[in-house]
C-alpha cells in the first residue's frame, strides 16, 4: 500500500468522476446522481485510508509525492499532508456525499417535486434546465459534476506542497462555484451574488498572484528559484533570502489579502451573505464549510510559515480585525429577519474566532482553530441544511412566517435545536472545545481581545435562541400546518452530522492527537512559543523575541 500514490488518487477520483458524469447521456439524470454518490463515497474511502495510515508522531509531511512539472521555474507536482491537512481532507470528503444527498433535488424541475420528496415547488424551473422543445438538458449532470470538481480542487489545495500548484487550484475552484451559485441558486439575485462572489475572490487572487511571482523572484535572487513550499520555508528559517524586510511584508500582505477574502475576515466579508442566501442550502454549505476553509488553512500554512516575521509584525492588527468580525457577525445576525442570512452572518463570527486563534500564535490557539475548522464545518452544515429543509417546505425565508414548527415537525425542530446549540458552542457539543481552546490561547497573548471574544458567546446565544423561539415554539402559524417532518433522505444527511457533533463534543482526543504535532511543528518553524503564565508583564530584553510586532491598534 505504501507504493500507491494515495494523494494523487484522492484528488483525481472526484475530478475524473466529474468528467465522466458530464459525458453521460442527457436523459440519465438518476444515473448522474448515483454516479456522483459512488464517486464521493470512493473519495471518502481513500481519505480514510490516508488518515488511517498517517502517523502523527512521524515526519511532519507524509505521503509525499514529488515530480517535475515546470522545471524552468522550479515548479513541481509536490504533494504531502500534515495533521492539519488530514483533518481538512476528512471534513471535505465526509461532507460531499452528504451534500449530494441534501441537494438531491436542487437541479430537478419544479414539476417533479412533491411534499413526499421533502421539497415543495417554490418557483418554476429555470429555462436553462430545459431545451426549446421542453426536453431536459444536462442540469443534473452539471450540478453533480461541479460539486465533485470543487471537491477535487479543495483537496488539491490542501495537499499541495508547491506554492504555484496551490495557487492554480486555489483560483480554479472559483469557476465551478460561480456556476453553482448563478446557475442553480434559488434566489432572484443569484446572478448578481455569483458575480459579486467571483469579482471579490478574483481580485484577491490577482493580488496573491503578484505575491507568488514576487516570492519566486526573491528565491531566484538569493538561491535557485523555486516554488517548493518546504524549500522556501527552510530557506527563510536559515536566513538565505536577504531581501529587505519591507519586501517580505508586502508579499505577506499579498497572500493574506486573498486568504482574508476567501475566509472571510472582516471587513472583506461582504460577498458572503448574498452568495450564501442566493445559493441552494447544499451549495451554501459547500462554500462556507468546505471551500472557505482553504482561506484559513492558507493563513496557517502559507502566511505563517513563509513569512514568520511579517506575521508577527501584523499580528495585533489581524487579531483586532478578527475580534471585530466576531462581534460584528453576532450583532448583525441579531438584527436579521431572513433565516438564511442570519445563519450566514454567524459564520462570519465563527471565522473571526478561527483567524484570531491562528494569529495569536499559541499552541492552544492554533490547535483550537484547526479543530474549529472541523467543528464549524459540521455545525454549519447541520444548521444550514436543516433550515433549508424547513424553508423548502414552507417556501419562505422570513422568520416572521414561522411559529409552532415543533408541533408539526418534532424531529426537524429537535435536530435544529441540537445544531443551533452547537453553533453557540454549548458544552457537550463539538464547537465548545475548539472555541474554549481559541479563547484560552488568545487570553494568554491578548487578554483584552479574549474578553471581547467572550461577549460574542452571549450574543450568539441571543440570536440562536431568539431564532428557535420565533420559528419552532408557540402556536402553529397560518400556513405551517402542512409542514412535514424530515423524510428518510433528509435523515440520512442530518443523523451523521448530529452524531459527529455529539461524539466530538465529548471525545475530541483522536482529532487533537493528529492536530497537535502539526501545530507544534508550525510553532517551531515560525520561532514562536507560548507565553509564560505570569501576573506581571515585565518589559522583554532587547532581542528577546524573534521579531517585533507592529503597533497595536
From Swiss-Prot:
Per the entry, what this protein does is: NDH-1 shuttles electrons from NADH, via FMN and iron-sulfur (Fe-S) centers, to quinones in the respiratory chain. The immediate electron acceptor for the enzyme in this species is believed to be menaquinone. Couples the redox reaction to proton translocation (for every two electrons transferred, four hydrogen ions are translocated across the cytoplasmic membrane), and thus conserves the redox energy in a proton gradient.
Q: Which domain of life is it from?
A: Bacteria
Q: Give a GO biological-process term.
A: ATP synthesis coupled electron transport
- Look up keyword Lipid metabolism and say if it applies: no
Q: Name one Pfam family in it.
A: Proton_antipo_M
| Family, as annotated | Belongs to the complex I subunit 4 family.
Give the reactions, separated by semicolons, that this protein catalyses. Answer: a quinone + NADH + 5 H(+)(in) = a quinol + NAD(+) + 4 H(+)(out)
Q: What is the lineage of its organism?
A: Bacteria, Bacillati, Actinomycetota, Actinomycetes, Mycobacteriales
State the EC number(s).
Answer: 7.1.1.-
Supply the name of the protein: NADH-quinone oxidoreductase subunit M
In which organism is this protein found? Mycobacterium tuberculosis (strain ATCC 25618 / H37Rv)
What are the TM regions of this chain, as residue ranges?
4-24, 34-54, 84-104, 140-160, 164-184, 197-217, 246-266, 316-336, 342-362, 371-391, 420-440, 447-467, 492-512
Picking any one GO molecular function of the record gives: NADH dehydrogenase (ubiquinone) activity
Residue ranges, annotated region (Disordered): 113-135, 527-553
Amino acid at each position: 500500500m505504501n507504493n500507491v500514490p494515495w494523494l494523487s488518487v484522492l484528488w483525481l477520483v472526484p475530478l475524473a468522476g466529474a468528467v465522466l458524469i458530464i459525458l453521460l447521456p442527457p436523459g440519465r439524470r438518476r444515473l448522474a446522481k448515483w454516479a456522483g454518490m459512488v464517486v464521493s463515497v470512493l473519495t471518502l474511502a481513500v481519505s480514510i485510508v490516508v488518515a488511517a495510515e498517517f502517523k502523527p508522531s512521524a515526519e511532519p509531511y507524509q505521503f509525499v509525492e514529488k515530480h517535475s512539472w515546470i522545471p524552468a521555474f522550479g515548479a513541481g507536482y509536490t504533494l504531502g499532508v500534515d495533521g492539519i491537512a488530514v483533518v481538512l481532507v476528512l471534513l471535505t470528503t465526509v461532507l460531499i456525499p452528504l451534500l449530494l444527498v441534501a441537494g438531491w433535488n436542487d437541479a430537478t424541475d419544479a414539476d417533479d417535486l412533491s411534499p413526499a420528496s421533502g421539497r415543495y415547488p417554490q418557483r418554476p424551473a429555470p429555462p436553462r434546465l430545459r431545451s426549446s422543445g421542453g426536453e431536459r438538458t444536462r442540469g443534473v449532470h452539471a450540478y453533480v459534476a461541479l460539486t465533485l470538481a470543487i471537491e477535487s480542487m479543495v483537496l488539491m489545495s490542501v495537499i499541495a506542497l508547491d506554492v504555484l500548484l496551490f495557487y492554480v487550484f486555489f483560483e480554479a475552484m472559483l469557476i465551478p462555484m460561480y456556476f453553482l451559485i448563478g446557475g442553480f441558486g434559488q434566489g432572484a439575485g443569484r446572478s448578481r451574488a455569483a458575480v459579486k462572489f467571483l469579482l471579490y475572490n478574483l481580485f484577491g487572487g490577482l493580488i496573491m498572484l503578484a505575491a507568488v511571482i514576487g516570492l519566486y523572484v526573491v528565491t531566484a535572487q538569493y538561491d535557485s528559484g523555486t516554488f517548493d513550499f518546504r524549500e522556501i520555508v527552510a530557506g527563510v528559517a536559515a536566513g538565505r533570502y536577504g531581501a529587505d524586510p519591507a519586501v517580505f511584508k508586502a508579499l505577506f500582505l499579498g497572500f493574506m489579502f486573498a486568504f482574508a477574502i476567501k475566509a472571510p475576515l472582516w471587513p472583506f466579508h461582504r460577498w458572503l451573505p448574498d452568495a450564501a442566501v442566493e445559493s441552494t442550502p447544499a451549495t451554501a454549505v459547500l462554500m462556507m464549510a468546505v471551500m472557505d476553509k482553504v482561506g484559513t488553512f492558507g493563513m496557517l500554512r502559507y502566511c505563517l510559515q513563509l513569512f514568520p516575521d511579517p506575521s508577527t509584525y501584523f499580528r495585533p492588527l489581524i487579531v483586532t480585525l478578527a475580534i471585530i468580525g466576531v462581534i460584528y457577525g453576532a450583532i448583525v445576525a441579531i438584527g436579521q429577519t431572513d433565516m438564511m442570512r442570519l445563519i450566514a452572518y454567524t459564520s462570519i463570527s465563527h471565522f473571526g474566532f478561527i483567524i484570531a486563534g491562528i494569529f495569536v500564535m499559541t499552541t492552544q490557539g492554533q490547535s483550537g482553530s484547526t479543530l474549529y475548522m472541523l467543528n464549524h464545518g459540521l455545525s454549519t452544515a447541520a444548521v444550514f441544511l436543516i433550515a433549508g429543509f424547513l424553508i423548502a417546505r414552507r417556501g419562505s425565508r422570513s422568520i416572521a412566517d414561522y411559529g409552532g414548527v415543533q408541533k408539526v415537525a418534532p424531529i426537524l425542530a429537535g435536530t435544529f435545536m441540537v445544531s443551533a446549540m452547537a453553533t453557540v458552542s454549548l458544552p457537550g457539543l463539538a464547537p465548545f472545545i475548539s472555541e474554549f481552546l481559541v479563547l484560552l490561547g488568545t487570553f494568554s497573548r491578548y487578554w483584552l481581545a479574549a474578553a471581547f471574544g467572550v461577549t460574542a458567546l452571549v450574543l450568539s446565544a441571543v440570536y440562536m435562541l431568539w431564532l428557535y423561539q420565533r420559528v419552532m415554539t408557540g402556536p402553529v402559524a397560518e400556513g405551517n400546518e402542512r409542514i412535514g417532518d424530515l423524510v428518510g433522505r433528509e435523515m440520512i444527511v442530518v443523523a451523521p452530522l448530529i452524531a459527529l457533533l455529539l461524539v466530538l463534543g465529548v471525545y475530541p482526543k483522536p482529532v487533537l492527537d493528529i492536530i497537535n504535532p502539526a501545530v507544534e511543528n508550525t510553532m517551531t518553524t515560525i520561532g514562536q512559543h507560548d507565553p509564560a503564565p505570569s501576573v506581571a508583564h515585565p518589559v522583554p530584553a532587547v532581542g528577546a523575541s524573534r521579531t517585533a510586532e507592529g503597533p497595536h491598534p
